[in-house]
């Protein structure tokens, strides 16, 4: 009986589009003290290619990414319309030309993302919405939070 109820609950969860969207959405997170509450998709692209260097108010932006193969990285590459090799070449060229001081900080886990958010007040990162931790502030993308219909980062 309990097994049947558990399986029924899992089936209902898997058929719920809202629950499915929330589990596959990638949130844009910043440090809790960051005054940002919303970012346009275009500005997010500019941010993650290093074209935007500071938040409104002057705080320097620090890009924090997950490694290749992670869902967050897949969404980042989709956002930037780049392959993994193009992304690596892009950042190598940015640093070589002096247009960036360093490549984005790449971390292997959500726990390390959280720690980086604490260490760098201007940090911004992409995090699977179900993995958002205390100390990470989710901001809207084009006025929408993860889980909303039409949310862009899936």
Predicted regions and their residues:
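Sec/Tat signal peptide C-region and signal peptidase I cleavage site
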Residues: 15-21
